[in-house]
Design a protein with these regions (language model features):
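Carbohydrate-associated surface elements
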Residues: 154, 174
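Short hydrophobic beta-strand element within catalytic cores of glycosyltransferases
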Residues: 321-324
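Glycosyltransferase donor-sugar binding loop
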Residues: 39-45, 198, 231-247, 282
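Membrane-proximal helix-turn-helix segments that form the acceptor-binding/catalytic region
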Residues: 131-147
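A conserved mid-protein helix/loop that constitutes part of the nucleotide-sugar donor-binding site
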Residues: 19, 23, 193, 197-218, ...
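A short, well-ordered alpha-helix in the C-terminal region of glycosyltransferases
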Residues: 370-385, 394-396
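Aromatic "clamp/platform" in nucleotide-sugar-dependent glycosyltransferases that forms part
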Residues: 304
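Nucleotide-activated donor-binding/catalytic signature segment of Leloir-type glycosyltransferases, i.e.
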Residues: 244-284
């Protein structure tokens, strides 16, 4: 079997979608039975991340004009017609148009993976641009899809709510299980415990509400036990200048913030990471990312909208207790007591602060053993449902079924 995989980016520029799709395509190759051909758009990280694809060698086309459109003159020529089917994890840019034309030309099965892009919150973000894309090509691409890959039941419901009636297969993301026989706490500052956020720093992640709640928890009048023994660590790549807004908010809230960018600390006026309530560490990949996960004591994702977040699965894989919103679409985490539920309210407004405070207070006042048991339940959940060999097997079975094999 030959499968064509169409992506917008084959590098870290696409954040968690890159991590998820690279891992899935590599797992399919490892499982055997399918030849995978990956195509995407070139960006500033394409060469740096090429080695992470292992035996796969993605082919890329150069983008001309605005990156938000992603037009690449040579892209259509990369879409092979001698494959059995195509899998597309792209909706809003030129590759969607190209794969639509490929499907019209070949008539072969097309699997579309929206990765949360059809959720109500995501559709309302940059609404006019998405309406234009829908009118020009996206809706036709969706109507021509043979099947949709939903990451969770909630995403399947969102696909149906968009008016699509084709087959939907729920195939979640997965993660690698790290060896936890060794621990790493050298990154901790003065023995402080770490609450980690790791991911794209974007308004939809709910960090405004989380910081407001953190400020209340860290307040000198707070009744929360052990609050001064913790730091809030925010690591990830900035989008739309939101990191700067969060740093400004720290100042307004009286939180001592420290940034890995030296010039920023002249503004933040926090002399050292040891003295900080909040650490901004910038993007983290590879070994640096692993080090952060190993040195963390808990994980938080207060998001307004997700497909199925890789970051939570990775946190569980490292045995971390998790604070997350229902919009992370991992209800099994709450059901198995691997996560505490917090509610995002409206864009981090007052309605969310109390929920965040309660969740943070519960986490901080738990004993080390209670947090460790919560993290262990998360790792067990990953072992049972979210490893890449399992996900690759589900995907391969879907491909074979679509081809009538």
């Amino acid at each position: 079997m030959r499968a064509l995989t169409v992506l917008e980016s084959v590098s870290r520029a696409d954040g968690g979608i890159f991590e998820a799709e690279r891992s899935l395509q590599c797992a399919l190759v490892k499982a055997g039975g399918v030849e995978v051909r990956v195509v995407g758009l070139r960006d500033e990280f394409t060469e740096a991340d090429a080695g992470s694809w292992g035996a796969l060698r993605p082919r890329v086309a150069e983008v001309f004009g605005p990156k938000g459109i992603g037009y690449a003159q040579g892209f259509a020529g990369l879409l092979d017609t001698d494959v059995d089917l195509a899998y597309a994890a792209t909706l809003w840019k030129y590759p969607s148009w190209a794969v639509l034309n490929w499907q019209k030309k070949t008539g072969k099965p097309l699997v579309v993976a929206p990765h949360g892009s059809l959720d109500a919150w995501a559709l309302n973000n940059s609404r006019w641009k998405k309406r234009l894309a829908a009118w020009f090509f996206k809706d036709e691409q969706l109507r021509r899809a043979s099947c949709f890959r939903a990451l969770c039941v909630a995403e399947a419901d969102a696909i149906r709510a968009y008016g699509l009636r084709q087959r939907i297969e729920v195939v979640p993301n997965g993660v690698e299980l790290p060896d936890l026989s060794t621990t790493e706490d050298t990154e901790n500052t003065e023995g402080k415990r770490r609450l980690l956020f790791l991911g794209r720093i974007h308004p939809k992640k709910g960090l405004v509400g989380a910081l407001r709640a953190w400020a209340d928890i860290q307040n000198s009048n707070s009744k929360t036990q052990n609050s001064k023994q913790w730091q809030f660590v925010i690591a990830g790549w900035d989008q739309e200048g939101h990191e700067g807004e969060l740093k400004g908010l720290c100042g307004e809230l009286g939180l001592k913030a420290f940034s890995s960018a030296r010039q920023e600390n002249l503004k933040l006026k926090t002399p050292s990471p040891e003295a900080a309530d909040v650490l901004f560490l910038g993007p983290a990949f590879g070994m640096e990312k692993e080090s952060l996960l190993r040195s963390a004591d808990a994980f938080i994702l207060p998001s307004f909208s997700e497909g199925l977040p890789m970051s939570v699965l990775e946190a569980w894989a490292y045995g971390l207790p998790v604070l997350m919103t229902p919009e992370c679409h991992l209800p099994e985490g709450f059901a198995s007591s691997a996560a505490l539920e917090i509610r995002s309210g409206e864009e981090g407004g007052p309605g969310s602060d109390f929920s965040f405070q309660e969740g943070l207070r519960t986490l901080l006042e738990m004993s080390d053993r209670e947090r460790a048991l919560m993290g262990a339940r998360g790792r067990k959940l990953v072992e049972e449902k979210f490893t890449w060999p399992k996900i690759a097997s589900q995907t391969l079975a879907l491909y074979e079924d679509l081809l009538g094999r």
